[in-house]
């Protein structure tokens, strides 16, 4: 009987085909669409509604990859902030350096920076990347009223970080603290905007939620002029709207949008998240649904 040698396909299946030197090797990475990377530098929120947690949810919803550097660990929920542990500046710097060493960061968002040494460390790191869009949310006080920035750090924030901002996103109380002018008085609005722009950012998105009236008016200003966003005031207060707005804005800047277009998309995103908001809490603040 004549013996026949069996082929690999008749034994354990065909061997994998090895490309010859002449045949092109498939480039797997070239088939994967690039995802913009955004770095958020902010405090954590144990309740998940604001801070780093809100930023990362927003980044995912906006289709970008989120990285983070935590500046402070807070014990908080929708009722308030019960504890704040500020990380040493060297630990914040180490996180930022680790991200930049490995990821092609396309935009940066800053939130709660907590202390003057942390602000200096962040500003020093950002100066090494002058072309990066930077969204500065000047977090001073939590929605519940807790102070989130040391009293001696405000001047450092103004002098060292605001000149690096592509877009500055203060609410009215924050704008008043930064300019020394009553930002809730509509007669002062133009003067407040001018003072904020003089601090160095390329653009300002002033959040009007703390003003009185049935409508909320947010205003965007840059060298090309002003743009106003008007929406109906919703009942009650929400948690994490400022963080979410700044994070959405940074995500759109990372995609290459202009600051004006990014602001328009970010405001619309927050309004949708508010409309879908839910009450997974015993406290009095609404949580956004991303």
Give residue spans per PLM region.
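Charged C-terminal helix
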Residues: 2-4, 35, 86, 102, ...
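Intrinsically disordered, low-complexity proline-rich regions
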Residues: 14, 19-21, 28-31
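Phosphate-handling active-site elements
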Residues: 62-67, 227, 252-266
